[in-house]
């Protein structure tokens, strides 16, 4: 059974464990804790176990922005990221929703296009040699 809810402090350890970056970057673990405490982190549970998380805030030019989307390695390629994106879009309290990903992340590009996003621009100089592509999706009722 799949359930998506706002992450709570008791989820933090599991979110850090599924995050491939947090395994070697303590600052990511601290960021996960901050997102949970801020009430912007949503966790996707499969049979009660944390499988993925996403972070949605509304501080990107007063628009919704999916800041992070992470699926645990053992749960990838099962459609969970798409379900999480759709959940975050439904939670967006603004008429515009944005997100971004590196140019090299072709799997995320495909997911976003399938979820109704369109490319909206790019940002150079975040990751050397791998621009950040920005994507946009209108939100009905936002």
How does the language model describe each region?
Residues 62, 95, 118:
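Short acidic/polar active-site loop segments enriched in Thr and Asp
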Residues 2, 6-68, 72, 85, ...:
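Acetyl-CoA-dependent GNAT
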Residues 91-103:
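Conserved GNAT acetyl-CoA-binding A-motif
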Residues 78, 106, 129:
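Loop/helix-junction capping segments adjacent to catalytic residues or to phosphate/diphosphate-binding pockets
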Residues 69-76, 101-103:
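A short, internal acetyl-CoA/4′-phosphopantetheine-binding micro-motif in the GNAT/acyltransferase core
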Residues 71, 77-90, 110, 114:
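Conserved acetyl-CoA-binding loop-helix of GNAT-fold acetyltransferases
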Residues 38, 108, 131-132:
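Short Asp/Glu-rich motifs
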Residues 98-100, 116-134:
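Conserved catalytic-core motifs of GNAT/GCN5-like acyltransferases
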């Amino acid at each position: 059974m799949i359930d998506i809810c706002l992450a709570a402090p008791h989820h933090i350890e599991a979110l850090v464990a599924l995050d491939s970056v947090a395994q070697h970057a303590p600052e990511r673990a601290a960021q996960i804790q901050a997102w949970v405490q801020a009430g912007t982190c949503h966790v996707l549970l499969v049979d009660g176990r944390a499988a993925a998380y996403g972070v949605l805030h509304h501080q990107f030019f007063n628009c919704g922005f999916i800041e992070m989307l992470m699926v645990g390695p053992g749960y990838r390629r099962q459609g969970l990221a798409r379900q999480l994106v759709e959940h975050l879009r439904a939670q967006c309290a603004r008429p515009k929703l944005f997100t971004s990903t590196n140019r090299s992340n072709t799997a995320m590009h495909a997911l976003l296009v399938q979820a109704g996003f369109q490319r909206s621009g790019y940002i150079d100089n975040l990751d050397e040699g791998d621009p950040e592509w920005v994507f946009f999706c209108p939100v009905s009722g936002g």
